[in-house]
């Protein structure tokens, strides 16, 4: 389990000092909860996020164990080093909005007909309780030919989950190569 510290000071000076010591600055928030300004060892955070098998994972901050989901992160544009991360507490029974990744399976038929596979949405916004949160949406693109696309309405959504994105938006498609 990932362990972090609660930041006493939230100023820029304190944040810079923590970053120099190898910490990643994080904000943890949730519906009806007080925001927690935390810091995690950057290498431990990256290891934990890479090895997680579900969208939500446990962190321990200030003696509390919280089940969180990565909402947003900021990277340095030059070094690609993580600078900041926002974590949302996934509370059981509380309906909230989450971004769920899209996994593409198969090879599109249109790729053999001089087409190019274009994934326009890498994550889809859903509204659900934490216990119904899917880890990812799997899309089979084997039947896609040049000019075809899979829309948000074509995604199979589990029970208890509602799609927030507009249903006419393309998720993945095959276009003619120029």
Swiss-Prot record:
GO terms for molecular function: 5S rRNA binding; structural constituent of ribosome. InterPro entries: Rbsml_bL25/Gln-tRNA_synth_N (IPR020056), Ribosomal_bL25/Gln-tRNA_synth (IPR011035), Ribosomal_bL25_b-dom (IPR020057), Ribosomal_bL25_C (IPR037121), Ribosomal_bL25_long (IPR001021), Ribosomal_L25_dom (IPR029751), Ribosomal_uL5_bac-type (IPR020930). GO terms for cellular component: cytosolic large ribosomal subunit. The keyword Cell membrane does not apply. The keyword Phosphoprotein does not apply. GO terms for biological process: translation. Keywords: Ribonucleoprotein, Ribosomal protein, RNA-binding, rRNA-binding. Gene3D superfamilies: Ribosomal protein L25, beta domain (2.170.120.20), Ribosomal Protein L25, Chain P (2.40.240.10). Belongs to the bacterial ribosomal protein bL25 family. CTC subfamily. Part of the 50S ribosomal subunit; part of the 5S rRNA/L5/L18/L25 subcomplex. Contacts the 5S rRNA. Binds to the 5S rRNA independently of L5 and L18. HAMAP family: Ribosomal_bL25_CTC. This is one of the proteins that binds to the 5S RNA in the ribosome where it forms part of the central protuberance. This is Large ribosomal subunit protein bL25. It comes from Campylobacter lari (strain RM2100 / D67 / ATCC BAA-1060).
